[in-house]
């Protein structure tokens, strides 16, 4: 289990539907896509894929209060 903290998370919406989630972690940007309930596929610069469970606070508008990440 890996626990980490994202410094910032953005949801990118199109037609009122979430298209992708951009996570900023330690000055690195990751694009994450939902693959199922509680699961997110994280793509590291298009080279590696890692299945993650991401717990984040959706109360803030741009979701800056992030959260715990556990690698499955």
Curated annotation (Swiss-Prot):
Superkingdom, taxonomy of origin: Viruses
Q: What is this protein called?
A: Uncharacterized protein FPV007/FPV254
Q: Which species is this UniProt entry from?
A: Fowlpox virus (strain NVSL)
What is the taxonomic lineage of the source species? Viruses, Varidnaviria, Bamfordvirae, Nucleocytoviricota, Pokkesviricetes
């Amino acid at each position: 289990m890996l626990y980490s903290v994202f410094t910032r998370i953005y949801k990118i919406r199109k037609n009122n539907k979430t298209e992708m989630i951009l996570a900023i972690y330690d000055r690195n940007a990751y694009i994450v896509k939902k693959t199922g309930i509680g699961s997110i596929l994280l793509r590291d610069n298009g080279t590696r894929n890692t299945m993650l469970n991401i717990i984040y606070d959706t109360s803030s508008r741009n979701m800056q209060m992030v959260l715990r990440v556990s690698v499955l």
